[in-house]
Amino acid sequence: MNKTIKIALAVGLGLLLNACSMVYQQPTGASVAIDKDTELALPLPAELGYSFTASQLISATWQDDTQQLPVQVEVTPDKVVLAGFSSWGTRILSLQYQNQAIETQVLSGLGATLPQPEQVLFNLMLTLWPVEAWAQPLQSIGWHLVDTDNSRTVFDDNQQAIIRIEYQADPGTHKTTGNIVFKHLTQGYTITIQTLNSTIVDNPSKS
């Protein structure tokens, strides 16, 4: 399975005992690798348009294998903070996106078995940030996004559909009130985001 979609929560006890510290990685620019040759700039946190905190359960399916990762998410006008946890409650990855830089931490020894925190951030932002926030970043690499009431699809520079996101929320409700299904059409994996609880607050108006 591609490293970016592996979510391993059942880690052996021996590995856990040898991996009890977080590894800090150097801050990087506000972009993520969406394939081996392409870097995509991310929208700013404030472009979401509101502040958001949530507990979510991410389920990743590839072929016949499904793994789960509980996450906590906080979005404010100046930053995005997320943390992923093991099934026993240990924080195993975290990320902060602020001041156009991304800083990540992964539990020592687990880097090869966990999704890259930047990819978790990309999936979150692609599902929730408005299409207007994504227009310029996608246009800069020749990609574009088509949005409907209950889905959005990302097309590459060859007009091939690459990612399709389906929203199962009831009409007129926030996208996170139902499951969000993220399908990578070329790499063949599916991510389901279930929001267990959330709080949404309008950002203060600029004077």
Pin down the residues of each PLM region.
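Bacterial signal peptide processing site
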Residues: S21-Y24
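A mature extracytoplasmic/lumenal domain signature
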Residues: G84-W88, Y97-A101, V106-L110, T195-N197
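Extracytoplasmic beta-rich ectodomain segments of secreted or membrane-anchored proteins
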Residues: Q63-Q98
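C-terminal motif of bacterial Sec signal peptides marking the signal peptidase cleavage site
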Residues: L16-A19
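Acidic/charged, solvent-exposed loop-and-adjacent secondary-structure segments enriched in E/D, K/R, S/T
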Residues: I102-W129
